């Protein structure tokens, strides 16, 4: 093995002690001398693993309540020493080589995420010695192994066992990259935390304790290379946030089917996030990032049949998301009726897996069950910059709706208004959604004119033979003119939900009253671009 380096001395100092005892035992069995600190040293000693405390090794005690443990020339000289070049200096200063460093860092992210975390708590969980050792070992990867992730313990041990206690340069280099990624992410988290406490120099609007740091740092890890991007001439890859464990397309497990494409991932995200809005059994069918059919049902099969009925033409080649365990009967209805790119559900039953397995190209994903929506950020790339905002988790309750017309919505209309409003949140602006009895009747998406979105929703319903009469309508933003209300009335809409806020609200309300319609304002907009 070219550039092999034997491991004779290792320094182990970890906050997350997962697997460290077994790793230390295996290193000891291969004749490696072990150095360690604090809790790690105690864990090893308590379990009968011979270990030398770093303070005994350096001849200098830990000081300042443990703030200074490993910051010593015997430690860093041993890590940074260039084999074949620095031996005279090492001998003169009684420094021995350290061939392997296993370190993970104080749990800063977990600490600051805790309710009631103080600045002092955060400061005490900023690791100093750990990152210093990690960077030193990674810099000297020509001679030293650095391990920052417990999942790599077995990899290192296997290579040592196969090569007489030595590791290859390729392995050391790969682990060094992981180490620099680890420290970069760690420093980024700290910078983000402190960056929210000071005003950005470029804004007169900013204030202390902003949720947006003046310098934004994040780290995403490549999950997979994609065949191509949005179009075949664009290359692409899928990166994920390892700090997120929320049920999502990023954390989902693919059970079968072809590899996910760029567009599959984007559309699956849109479908899944929409279906999460509903408590009753629900199905969302998405095409080109827009819901083309959404419905509630007594069960998943009922919900799917009703969602499909909205727009069977657009559902062809679409993405289907559910908020319940996918059963065999529903899976059979899908694969027997239509061509589908992706099916995603929190859980997929064995019966459903067996059914979908007959269609080997269908991508079947299981994302796990979600509980409540978690706070997060949305990003939009612009040339030379990045727009960052809160994830749109705003939603009104029935009690918060403001009735602005003479006629008050019926109980049935109110239920449909709430359903329709949730769907509109996921339709590209300008968005108009018609719905009746927990089912979309028509969807008008992405038009520059709101009235044309309303017309398209009506056309869609007519094309599929769906009765608009008595349906409700949701608009993601206010109506600037009465023409949208007139178009809705002509189509048979009985009730409207919209944000309100136009300078012509009175004119719009008067139009609704003229048509005998009920209308409610949400005082909340749901633009989606």
UniProtKB/Swiss-Prot annotation:
Keywords: Hydrolase, Multifunctional enzyme, Purine biosynthesis, Transferase. Its EC number is 2.1.2.3, 3.5.4.10. Residues 1-148 form the MGS-like domain. Pathway: Purine metabolism; IMP biosynthesis via de novo pathway; 5-formamido-1-(5-phospho-D-ribosyl)imidazole-4-carboxamide from 5-amino-1-(5-phospho-D-ribosyl)imidazole-4-carboxamide (10-formyl THF route): step 1/1; Purine metabolism; IMP biosynthesis via de novo pathway; IMP from 5-formamido-1-(5-phospho-D-ribosyl)imidazole-4-carboxamide: step 1/1. GO terms for molecular function: IMP cyclohydrolase activity; phosphoribosylaminoimidazolecarboxamide formyltransferase activity. Belongs to the PurH family. PANTHER family: BIFUNCTIONAL PURINE BIOSYNTHESIS PROTEIN ATIC, BIFUNCTIONAL PURINE BIOSYNTHESIS PROTEIN PURH. The IMP cyclohydrolase activity resides in the N-terminal region. This is Bifunctional purine biosynthesis protein PurH. It comes from Shewanella amazonensis (strain ATCC BAA-1098 / SB2B).
